[in-house]
Every structure is written in structure tokens, then in C-alpha cells.
């Protein structure tokens, strides 16, 4: 009995058909790159201070001293959320008293920003923060906005696979791209923070669903060798391209509504792809729609200038292949023994903390010294060599050592930021980018590593559970950034410490490189970290390794 890959082997590996599918599906990921990180600019918080209305009769000296000072990063700056009581200083101004000379400012009564705020417009002309005053008592709404987006991502990751299994890869791919583009457009007309946030969560659902289904469609259509490149470098690199495009849009469009409109329009260019991207023949076969599947393969053969054999698919053979039953498993199987439970708990921690590091570094760009647009571009650019490095390392070296190594690298350089003098801002930025490089490399290896640890029976469930843990990490990450408002170095100290910690834990995983993949839970129980013994090694065709999604989204 032949499998699907053997049936379509006559198409070749890298013909015009495969190249077209590779680049079109990868290109469909570009909007995910800039929509996923758009909150950096849509919800940017500029410098702000209490508004002192022009109608208040104050002398120029009292107007200049109407805001108390505080020490921030070693320098005196106006407070963002307090001002001196206007009635009091207006009375002093009318009496001709001078601040600091006739009146001790430290003894003056203070009040909150009763008349609103004035915002610095050097970086952002407007954001959702400036429009709805998400500062001071309401500053908690900003990280919550980002967290709820990732809650949408978490929900979308639940339903995307089930929808594509039921309705088909192609239909769900374009439906979810429409959801992402359509609701992003509706966000432009948000009248309050609540409306914006609900719509943003729906955009998150559409984004991850589009991403996952595009990945599934590519891995099912492309041949074995191309499948590896597509799943490791294709979607990752094009995601990074979208990430790098974001600051270019934001630099020239400083108003959040116009920026959102500009980020929405590229989604319309995906509409013509409907006529070029076919349905997955594998899915059609699973639905017993053999004639449609054969028609797609015939067109692919024609595009590749290959004469297809008559009767490509044998319905009886494929029906026999699809009727193979698998033993039912439940989530408790991931905790059946102490060894399996330990591996599962460590894997959940590894995914969650690595996700926290990746997203916290990505979202913390506005808090870096220097130009926020350049820093965001560099943050996206550094992902490209990180993905290539991860791909090369996975091909040649033991998994747990390379993952632990890049985590030590990423966490270590983040911890070094606290010893860099404030005058050397470029050094701090360089260390942040090196930390992002290490954590991104680690993140991109986790899917492959996790899939190789578990037997076939529970592999998808294990990857799903640990991937869910990474979504939880992304929901938590905005609050690491939020801590930067209290101390600029605190997020880096926490991220660096947790990344080094999880790097140490990674060393206790069993090694999967060059080892026969377990086929059942009993075989997995024999795997032990650091246990010296005879291991069954095989000449593993890397193209037969589990194919899994290896980017943050």
C-alpha cells in the first residue's frame, strides 16, 4: 500500500507548481508580521503631563512650575500624573509670589490631572492611548489590550484546525484572512477603548487561524524536501519581512487610524490568490473527493511539464489508507508516569517562558533608547538570521544542548544590560537585539524538539498543549513591559533570569537527535535525561521528522 507522497512522486520536488505554492503561501503570511506587532505603534504611550488650561490665570513662572518633578532614570523630569493644586498656585500668582523663592514647592498640595493631559507629539501624532487617555489610573488598559489580542490568538489556535478539517484548507484560509483584514478595517471606526479591544481580539483569532491553515496547506501540498524548507524558513522569513515593514509604515503615518488603514489595505492583495492556490489534495482524499484531488494533481503536472499517469489515485487503496484506526488518547496520557509527567511539565515551562521572552522583547521596543522605528525594524531584521541559524543547528547538533545554548546566550546578554552605563545606549540596544536573536532561535526549535520527544500516539496532543502554554506566555508578556514604567531595567532582569533558568531546565530533557522516534508511550518511558546507556540510533531521513510550525505565531 503506497502513501500519498509515493503516489504524487512523479511531480518532482521543486517544479513551477511547487515554487508557486511555496511563495504564494509564504507571502500570505506577510500581513501577520505587521498586524501581530502593530500594537507597538497603535498603543504607543508618548511622554505626557497634566494639562494646565490656558484659562487659568498664571504667571509664566508659575505655569512653568505647575508640575511637580520626580527622579526618573537618574534625572529630574515632570510628573506624568500629578500637578500642584491650581487654585492654590493661581492665588500665589495673583499675590505676586515667586515659586521656589517665596513659596516652598515641596510643601504645596498636589492633585490629579483633573483637566486631562497634554502629550508629546514628536514620535506619535495620535495613538489609542492619547485618544482615550489610557494613562495614570487607566494605564492598565494598555497591556490588557495586547493581552486580549493574544487571548484571541489562543482561541483562534483552538478552532482553526477543526474548521479546516471540516470545511477545507482553502476556504478557511481565505475566510480567516478576510476576518483579519475586515475586522482590522472596522477597528478604524472604534469609538472607545472597549470596542477597539474586542475587535482586536477578533483580529488575533483571524491572524493565528490564517497562519496555521496556510502552514497546514503548504505542508500537505508540497513534497517532502520542500516541506522542510517551507515550514522552517518560508513562513518564518516572510513573517519577519512583515515585521520589518511595520515600522516603515508607522514612520510615515503617525496617526493610529490612518496607520491601521494602511496596514489593512495589503490584505486586499491576497484576494487574487484564490485563483492560484488550490485546495489540499490530501484533504479532498480524506473527504473521498478523489476526482477533485486528481484534477488538481493533473494541473500541477501540466504546470511542471510532466505527463501524469492515467488514474493517479486508486480509491480502494486510499480508502484502505484512510481507514486505519488509531488508538484513542486523552490528555492524562501526557502524565501517565512520573517520567512522562516530568517531561510534559518541563516542556510547558520551556514554551511559556520562551514565549514571554520573545514577546516581551518585541513589545518593549518603545522603551528602548534611540529611535523607536529603527529599533522595531532591527527587532524584525534580527529574526531572519535567527531562523537560519536555528535551521542549521537543528540539522547537525543535539537538540537540548543547542536550545539551552541559545537560551543561555539570550538570557545572559539581557542580564548584562544593567551594567551598561546610560551614556552607552547603543550598547544596550545591541545587547537587546542579541538577546532577541537567542530567544527567537530557541523559540523556532521548540516545535521540532517537542514533536521528537513524544510518541506518534500523543505527538499532536503534546505539541498542542505546549503551544497553548506559549499563548499563555504571550498573554503575560505585556505585563513584563508594563513593569518598565517603574524601572527601565526591571523587564530585562526578569526576562534574563527566567531565560537562563529555563535554559538550565532544558539540559535535563532527554536527547532526541539521532534517536529513533518513540512509537508508543512505553518506548518513551525508557528515555532519560543524562542517562548513559545504549540508544537505538538510526540513519534518520530528516525529511521524515515531524513537520511542525516553528515561529512565534
Curated annotation (Swiss-Prot):
Record's Pfam families?
Sugar_tr (PF00083)
What is a single cellular component term in the Gene Ontology annotation?
basal plasma membrane
Mechanisms controlling activity: Allosterically activated by intracellular ATP.
Per the UniProt entry, what is one GO biological process?
amino acid import across plasma membrane
Which of the residues are on side Extracellular? Answer: 42-142, 193-197, 254-257, 361-373, 422-428, 484-488
Task: Report where it is expressed, by tissue.
Answer: Expressed in kidney. Expressed in small intestines. Expressed in liver in non-parenchymal liver tissue such as sinusoidal vessels. Weakly expressed in lung and brain. Expressed in testis and spleen. Expressed in heart.
TM segment ranges: 21-41, 143-163, 172-192, 198-218, 233-253, 258-278, 340-360, 374-394, 401-421, 429-449, 463-483, 489-509
Binding of ATP occurs at 218-225
Q: Which domain of life is it from?
A: Eukaryota
Q: Does the keyword 4Fe-4S apply?
A: no
Loss of function: phenotype = Knockout mice developed normally and did not display any gross phenotypic abnormalities. Knockout mice show a complete deficiency of ergothioneine in heart, liver, small intestine, kidney and erythrocytes. Impaired intestinal absorption and renal reabsorption of ergothioneine. Lower tolerance to intestinal oxidative stress.
| Glycosylation (residues) | 57, 64, 91
Which GO-annotated molecular functions does the record name? acetylcholine transmembrane transporter activity; amino acid transmembrane transporter activity; amino-acid betaine transmembrane transporter activity; ATP binding; carnitine transmembrane transporter activity; PDZ domain binding; symporter activity
Q: Which NCBIfam families match?
A: 2A0119
Protein name (Swiss-Prot/TrEMBL)? Solute carrier family 22 member 4
Please report the organism this UniProt entry assigns to the protein.
Mus musculus
Q: Give the gene that encodes this protein.
A: Slc22a4
